[in-house]
Amino acid sequence: MTTQLEQAWELAKQRFAAVGIDVEEALRQLDRLPVSMHCWQGDDVSGFENPEGSLTGGIQATGNYPGKARNASELRTDLEQAMRLIPGPKRLNLHAIYLESDTPVSRDQIKPEHFKNWVEWAKANQLGLDFNPSCFSHPLSADGFTLSHADDSIRQFWIDHCKASRRVSAYFGEQLGTPSVMNIWIPDGMKDITVDRLAPRQRLLAALDEVISEKLNPAHHIDAVESKLFGIGAESYTVGSNEFYMGYATSRQTALCLDAGHFHPTEVISDKISAAMLYVPQLLLHVSRPVRWDSDHVVLLDDETQAIASEIVRHDLFDRVHIGLDFFDASINRIAAWVIGTRNMKKALLRALLEPTAELRKLEAAGDYTARLALLEEQKSLSWQAVWEMYCQRHDTPTGSEWLESVRAYEKAILSQRG
């Protein structure tokens, strides 16, 4: 331990102790909060089913930074490089299109065996896995509908894909000893004025009921559903709206996924967490950064990221909220994108854990809003960075921006060779 870091750490402990915070306990709590990193940042959501195909479903990865992963081996190697630079517990979130097979596999026929390499890798790296059916970038999603499709056979194809995905998810949980959260997001919607908004939602309701009809061990698998305001090509109507999925998750007692970019730009998911928790058993968060729309920019340590983390910590939602990331920026080094976004999420959680919440609650209950605001603002300038640096050191990861040197070296040695 360097003398400088040790001195800063001791001073930070004293400063936080003065406001009633045990920093060692905060670090122990931080180690209870894994962040699920999303595999698709590494290859711009290409996957391995048809990596040269177009990305559809109203989502878009912009940029052409060299060195993106071209196969599962490269993607896993890139993930390992990123994870070495991120302290604390992590998980990996996979989409169905990241299967591995020597022969083509129809999406309604995916099986656990197509993901066994991911499971073995996760075991070796002490990671949990999460999962998603991939209801986009496919000929049978080309007209903008999947689980709500009016064609019975097409709708059944997507139902069967989601059913198969649940079995893969349960396999992850059984093999790794930690439940896999499987999130269903569909792009279904219409570009222009929609006359019948009810029928697609009726079909989606029935389809989802069929999807989750097979009983799976909740110790292995958790169902989640995700809403969206709009997507490219579905600006006027989205079948799976917030109201639809809030009602579905409440009535079926599934987890509800809140994506930071899936609402109107003036809405924030941090304000939705406490409301949703009154009705649903668990939440899945997709922490992202929307810039004017669901642009999926890299997560910053900004006000909303901090507010999300604070809601989790203030209400002791450690066992009911699953933290995932969802962004994909192809204009910068993809490994750096993972590192920046994930470290920022963890920094926000640490800052939340260092807040004197009990004292702030007392002030709020007493109506002393002056002191509440003063304390909240003074808290921002306390030396949380020294606590973060100690946390990084204990996890053998870089404490500051020196991680970028490792990324640059990897880029020169590995990424530059990919063409």
From Swiss-Prot:
Keywords (A to Z) from UniProt: Cytoplasm, Isomerase, Manganese, Metal-binding, Rhamnose metabolism
Entry's cofactor comment: Binds 1 Mn(2+) ion per subunit.
EC assignment: 5.3.1.14
Residues at which Mn(2+) binds: H262, D294, D296
Catalytic activity as recorded in UniProt: L-rhamnopyranose = L-rhamnulose
Pathway it works in: Carbohydrate degradation; L-rhamnose degradation; glycerone phosphate from L-rhamnose: step 1/3
Lineage top rank: taxon: Bacteria
Main location: cytoplasm
GO CC annotation, single: cytoplasm
Pfam families listed in its UniProt record: RhaA (PF06134)
InterPro entries linked: L-rhamnose_isomerase (IPR050337), Rhamnose_isomerase (IPR009308), Xyl_isomerase-like_sf (IPR036237)
Location in or out of the cell: Cytoplasm
Needed cofactors: Mn(2+)
Top-level EC class as recorded in UniProt: isomerase
Quaternary structure note: Homotetramer.
NCBIfam families: PRK01076.1, rhaA
Protein name as annotated: L-rhamnose isomerase
Species of the source: Escherichia coli O139:H28 (strain E24377A / ETEC)
Gene name of this polypeptide: rhaA
